[in-house]
Design a protein with these regions (language model features):
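A short SAM/SAH-binding and catalytic strip from SAM-dependent methyltransferases
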Residues: 137-151, 174
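C-terminal alpha-helical "lid/dimerization" subdomain adjacent to the S-adenosyl-L-methionine
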Residues: 171-226, 230, 236
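Conserved alpha-helix/loop element of class I SAM-dependent methyltransferases that forms part
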Residues: 28, 32, 42-62, 77
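A short acidic, Gly/Pro-enriched loop at the edge of an enzyme's catalytic core
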Residues: 127-138
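A short glycine-rich, Lys/Arg-flanked "PGG" loop and its adjoining helix->strand segment in the class I
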Residues: 152-167
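Class I SAM-dependent methyltransferase SAM/SAH-binding core
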Residues: 63-128
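Core SAM-dependent methyltransferase catalytic element
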Residues: 224, 230-253
């Protein structure tokens, strides 16, 4: 790969094409997004998201930006947990902004989102977020960073929009560290997920890309270094389900 090309799954394509090609993938799977995550995680993505929310520990008055937020399910979990705290302790309600470059993904989540008064949907690019500096307490991105063309640029944007003391949480598929688990998951991913995608959505190609994009994503240690390079402190990560997914976090200090 040279500076003029970038990975799109296992393909090498011109850098300027990736954003549109990724958008086309998610246009094609928007109506089946939750089923897609079920297929790629054995249905465990819901548990991973709940564990992520527990780690975040949402509080009243906090402002969340959920980048690549799609249908808004993570933002909904954030607001629900923050509201439970508010009911016990008092204070103002939390607010969430679901930001996604793909309007079809945002539209797919309209009917699913509760607490509509406290949640807004914004069409925007992770590499150039439509938010001012120092405006958010928490920024999340779940299963989205691997699809971003320039991940380092996006991480720098995340740092920009967070307030001092703000927290970043990145949930992403990863490569299992155990060789036996990796072999099993690779066999499942490459042999069955595209077939499931074809069965559920008539779209094997998009699911093939999503599987390949996981294998092209940096290791846990390398991605942690990328987060630190963007300015974050106290960067750490936790593997879920043997490393099928990983939660990364860091602070803007």
């Amino acid at each position: 790969m040279n500076k003029n090309t970038i990975d799109f799954g296992y393909q090498e394509i011109p850098v300027e094409e990736k954003k549109e090609r990724v958008k086309n993938v998610f246009d094609s799977v928007a109506g089946k997004y939750d089923l897609m995550n079920d297929a790629m995680s054995f249905g465990v993505h819901r548990l991973w998201k709940n564990l992520t929310i527990t780690k975040i520990n949402p509080q009243p008055r906090e402002i969340l930006i959920d980048v690549a937020g799609g249908t808004g399910d993570l933002a909904h979990r954030f607001l629900k947990r923050a509201e439970a705290v508010r009911v016990r302790r008092g204070g103002e309600s939390a607010t969430a902004y679901v930001c996604d470059i793909n309007d079809q993904m945002l539209l797919a989540g309209i009917d699913q989102i509760k607490n509509k008064n406290n949640i807004s949907r914004v069409c925007g690019d992770a590499q150039k977020l439509p938010f001012p500096d120092n405006c958010a307490d928490v920024l999340t991105i779940a299963f989205g960073i691997r699809n971003v063309t320039d991940r380092q640029s996006a991480l720098t944007e995340f740092f920009r929009v967070l307030k001092p003391g703000g927290r970043l949480f990145v949930l992403e598929f990863s490569t299992p560290e155990d060789k036996n688990l990796r072999k099993i998951y690779d066999t499942y991913s490459f042999s069955f997920i595209p077939k499931i995608g074809n069965l559920l959505a008539g779209n094997a190609e998009s699911y093939q890309y999503l599987v390949e994009s996981i294998r092209r994503f940096p290791s846990q240690n390398k991605f942690s270094i990328m987060i630190e390079t963007s300015g974050f402190s106290k960067v750490s990560f936790r593997n879920f389900s043997g490393g099928i997914a990983t939660l990364y976090w860091g602070w803007k200090i």
